[in-house]
């Protein structure tokens, strides 16, 4: 019984992207899950030929011609004899050679015709069974092809669904990355603006007592992003 075998594999990838926090930012992570599916399809077509055997008994026709003839002849002969002599005589009802030969030929002809009817009926039945077998195989082949087409359509639909899901996940990941970059840019801009608004002031004063005298050195530094001012004052005694 020959059959064909097809093996198909389907790989599903799922990607998960965690959300971003507005306070702490960790490196973007993606979780990829792979799911592999294998489909094995076998196909075959086979038909067992079973010709039903109908064993019909031959028709039986009960012919009572011999008994009827004997009754008619006997009664008629007895009536005639009674009128003539008042006695009866046994009648010999054995068939003549001509009748026997005719009966034999009829029996042979009946047997031949009966065999011919059986052969014709068997041939007709075999022919119809063969036609039915061909029709059944054609219908089975048609159904099998339709099922194969449906299976191919189902696989193509699942592939399209997987492609669409992956494309959707890619777009979502790109959108998340874009939003994270925009958030980082805003935080950098916020830090720059805070530095521009901030001021830093430093006061330094140094006092030295030496043999030459008393020395005092002082200075004030005020810095900002756009302005740096340094003022130094030096005193010597």
Curated annotation (Swiss-Prot):
Subcellular locations according to the entry: Cytoplasm; Nucleus
Keyword tags: Coiled coil, Cytoplasm, Nucleus, Repeat, Stress response
Span list, region CAHS motif 2: 169-187
Coiled coil: 98-201
Chain spans, region CAHS motif 1: 132-150
GO cellular component, one term: nucleus
Biased segments, Basic and acidic residues type: 1-17, 91-105, 226-237
Region: Disordered, residue numbers: 1-35, 85-105, 212-237
Other remarks on this protein: Trehalose, a disaccharide essential for several organisms to survive drying, is detected at low levels or not at all in some tardigrade species, indicating that tardigrades possess potentially novel mechanisms for surviving desiccation involving tardigrade-specific intrinsically disordered proteins (TDPs).
Protein function: CAHS proteins are cytosolic heat soluble proteins that seem to contribute to the anhydrobiosis in tardigrades, but their specific mechanisms are yet to be identified. It is possible that protection during anhydrobiosis might occur via the stabilization of vitrifying small molecules such as sugars, but not via the direct glass transition of CAHS proteins themselves.
This protein's domain notes: CAHS proteins contain 2 repeats of 19-mer peptides designated as CAHS-motifs that comprise each two octapeptides connected by a tripeptide.
Family: Belongs to the Cytosolic-abundant heat soluble protein (CAHS) family.
Stated name of the protein: Cytosolic-abundant heat soluble protein 1
Organism expressing this protein natively: Ramazzottius varieornatus (Water bear)
Name of the coding gene: CAHS1
């Amino acid at each position: 019984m020959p059959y064909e075998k097809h093996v198909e594999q389907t790989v599903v990838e799922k990607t998960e992207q965690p959300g971003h926090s507005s306070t702490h930012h960790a490196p973007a992570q993606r979780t990829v899950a792979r799911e592999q599916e294998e489909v094995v399809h076998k196909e075959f077509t086979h038909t067992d030929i079973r010709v039903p055997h109908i064993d019909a008994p031959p028709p039986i026709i009960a012919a009572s011609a011999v008994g009827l003839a004997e009754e008619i002849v006997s009664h008629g002969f007895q009536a005639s004899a009674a009128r003539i002599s008042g006695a009866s005589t046994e009648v010999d009802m054995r068939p003549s050679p001509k009748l026997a030969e005719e009966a034999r030929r009829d029996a042979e002809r009946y047997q031949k015709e009966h065999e011919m009817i059986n052969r014709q009926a068997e041939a007709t039945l075999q022919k119809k069974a063969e036609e039915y077998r061909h029709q059944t195989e054609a219908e089975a082949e048609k159904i099998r092809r339709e099922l194969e087409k449906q299976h191919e359509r189902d696989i193509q639909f699942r592939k399209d669904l997987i492609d669409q899901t992956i494309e959707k996940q890619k777009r979502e990941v790109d959108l998340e990355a874009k939003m994270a970059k925009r958030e980082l840019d805003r935080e950098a801009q916020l830090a720059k603006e805070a530095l521009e608004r901030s001021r830093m002031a430093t006061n330094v004063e140094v006092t030295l007592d030496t043999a030459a005298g008393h020395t005092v050195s002082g200075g004030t530094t005020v810095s900002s992003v756009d302005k740096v001012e340094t003022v130094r004052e030096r005193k010597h005694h």
